[in-house]
């Protein structure tokens, strides 16, 4: 049976199974897949899952590794990327909430997991890419000052670095949601967009994409469309960079300010602006009883690389990673030399 003959309900169930395999980053059996699906509100029996997996094998989407279970193939990844777009609308908003919940970073103790964006590029571009990246961090245009660096075959979180490539992990802005959630502060992520900065100060949003209405991360879209000017902002203080807008309960403002300070001390700072209760922030209206925050896009330093015509493949909100494995961006060159990347 070919892909065209699969009805919508079957395709959706198959996509759910493929997503479980993709998120796991390792082979899984039908029992583990079923447990994960049920946790997400999808109830499928093991026999049914095995039937779907057998069909996935026939289509080349999954590979049977015997007792180890199945793993997702490149063809399976392509199928997920092209799945029914109507089913993916709102996916970004759901992933933001999921990762914030899964993250367990303790800002007081400075331990636990944080959320990373993963960007891969050719080894031959490592030297100029690191230079562009560090310039953006020097100007304070990243989410904090910590990064991860992976050589071919290494892992950043559950993501394996491809052969002939290096990978850079930048802290995702959703990390701030997780830090607030640990303090019982519920955060609403309204949209991602582009912010115009002048002399290093944010002025206004020039473009916005709501998370609820998008199947892709907004900053990924803007970077691919070459709509940022992060490198120019790093050099002159004037430019356009990625940012996101969040709301939180105004009653929690003192604790929000405390958490922001703790985040900055831990190298995870990135709040560009914090508003007043019920007051607009960068011309964006905020309801009574709420306070607005503008958070720097974690992929901004990567945008500076892309602006230099270096080919980069980025995935926002890609992985959970232990805080202890991150390094200061100033150590990138030394770490790259030690790993044989320069």
What does each of the following model-derived ranges do?
Residues 77-101:
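Conserved segment of winged-helix/HTH DNA-binding domains
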């Amino acid at each position: 049976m070919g892909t065209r003959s699969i009805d919508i309900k079957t395709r959706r169930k198959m996509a759910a199974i493929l997503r479980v395999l993709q998120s796991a980053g390792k082979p899984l059996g039908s029992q583990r897949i079923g447990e994960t699906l049920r946790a997400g509100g999808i109830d499928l029996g093991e026999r049914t899952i095995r039937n779907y997996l057998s069909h996935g094998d026939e289509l080349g989407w999954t590979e049977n590794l015997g007792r180890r279970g199945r793993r997702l193939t490149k063809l399976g990844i392509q199928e997920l990327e092209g799945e029914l777009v109507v089913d993916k609308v709102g996916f970004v908003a759901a992933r933001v909430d999921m990762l914030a919940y899964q993250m367990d970073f303790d800002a007081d103790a400075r331990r636990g997991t944080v959320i990373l964006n993963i960007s891969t590029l050719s080894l031959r571009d490592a030297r100029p890419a690191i230079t562009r990246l560090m310039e953006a961090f020097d100007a304070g245009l990243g989410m904090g000052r910590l990064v991860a660096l992976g050589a071919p075959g290494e892992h950043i979180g559950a993501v394996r670095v491809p052969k002939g490539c290096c990978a850079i992990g930048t802290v995702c802005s959703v990390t701030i949601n997780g830090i607030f959630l640990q303090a019982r502060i519920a955060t609403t992520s309204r949209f991602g967009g582009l912010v115009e900065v002048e002399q290093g100060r944010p002025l206004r949003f020039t473009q916005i994409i709501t998370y609820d209405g998008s199947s892709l991360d907004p900053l990924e879209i803007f970077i691919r469309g070459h709509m940022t000017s992060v490198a120019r902002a790093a050099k002159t203080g004037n430019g356009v960079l990625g940012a996101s807008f969040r709301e939180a309960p105004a009653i929690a403002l003192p604790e929000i300010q405390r958490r922001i300070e703790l985040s900055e001390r831990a190298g995870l700072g990135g709040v560009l602006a914090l508003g007043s209760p019920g007051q607009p922030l960068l011309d964006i209206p905020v309801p009574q009883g709420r306070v607005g925050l503008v958070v720097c896009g974690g992929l901004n330093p990567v945008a500076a690389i892309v602006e230099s015509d270096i080919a980069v493949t980025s995935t926002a909100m890609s992985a959970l990673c232990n805080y202890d494995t991150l390094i200061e961006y100033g150590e990138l060159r030394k770490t790259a030399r030690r790993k044989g990347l320069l």
